[in-house]
């Protein structure tokens, strides 16, 4: 899943 920054979120 990607957060509002476009980085991986676990």
From Swiss-Prot:
Describe the PTM. Occurs in two forms, Rhopr-SK-1 contains unmodified Met-8 and Ox-Rhopr-SK-1 has oxidation at Met-8.
Q: What are the BP-aspect GO terms?
A: neuropeptide signaling pathway
4Fe-4S as a keyword of this entry, yes or no, is: no
Compartment(s): Secreted
Q: Where in this protein does the record say Pyrrolidone carboxylic acid is found? A: 1
Q: Where is this protein primarily located?
A: secreted
Q: Which GO terms describe its cellular component?
A: extracellular region
According to the lineage, what is the superkingdom? Eukaryota
Annotated InterPro entries: Gastrin/cholecystokinin_CS, Sulfakinin
Q: Which keywords label this protein?
A: Amidation, Neuropeptide, Oxidation, Pyrrolidone carboxylic acid, Secreted
> Where on the chain is Phenylalanine amide found, per UniProt?
10
- The PTM Methionine sulfoxide maps to 8
Record function comment: Myotropic peptide.
What family does the entry list?
Belongs to the gastrin/cholecystokinin family.
Q: What name is this protein filed under?
A: Sulfakinin-1
């Amino acid at each position: 899943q990607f957060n509002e920054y476009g980085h991986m979120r676990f």
